[in-house]
Swiss-Prot record:
Its main location: nucleus. Component of the little elongation complex (LEC), at least composed of ELL (ELL, ELL2 or ELL3), ZC3H8, ICE1 and ICE2. Interacts with ICE1 (via C-terminus domain). It comes from Homo sapiens. This is Zinc finger CCCH domain-containing protein 8. Coiled coil: none annotated.
Amino acid sequence: MDFENLFSKPPNPALGKTATDSDERIDDEIDTEVEETQEEKIKLECEQIPKKFRHSAISPKSSLHRKSRSKDYDVYSDNDICSQESEDNFAKELQQYIQAREMANAAQPEESTKKEGVKDTPQAAKQKNKNLKAGHKNGKQKKMKRKWPGPGNKGSNALLRNSGSQEEDGKPKEKQQHLSQAFINQHTVERKGKQICKYFLERKCIKGDQCKFDHDAEIEKKKEMCKFYVQGYCTRGENCLYLHNEYPCKFYHTGTKCYQGEYCKFSHAPLTPETQELLAKVLDTEKKSCK
């Protein structure tokens, strides 16, 4: 029976294949379900992450996938060729940059030297003009010196030399020896056979001991009353050229009463010929003013 059944109902030759196919389909369905569940989990995690960090975050699955791909392609990659080409290009660009930089640095000092030369030209011209002027002045001075050679010089230098030689010899100074007579008459006054400095007599001589004229004289006051003394603020005091308390009091000497008494600013002393003349002048001026 069994043998007949085999010929009448032969076994299905594809039965083994279908069984294996069904098993594989079941395994694929399980894998897809697992992958879908993993993808859903990843989506949920991404939704929970803020927007700022979503793009930066990388799933571990994708990173593993990338690593595997990089390992697979490392053997067949062309990185070595690309890197060599990029290095060659970089070296060429670097050489070009260095050459351009050197050219620019070489051009800058030339321009600066040109500018400095342009700036220095007016200064150099000014300096030349100054040197020419100085040389011209020196030439004039030399000519002036040549005009008056010898010991017979007429001028301030000669006077100083002669006075210095006299002082060394111990002789008395002769200040007026080398001065013209017109100059002496203009600036002096004769007193007792001496030429006295008229500015000294007026108390206006500034030179003092260095004055060329004599100061050996008594200063006589002018026979006039000091108007500042009458007003009460003459600052010169005893050095004033005008009369102060020497002037005669017209009230006392005319017989009228002087109300100032001892405190009078003018003199109550007996009249002298000089003071009598002064009193007469005062009385004459008053009579003329009354008329």
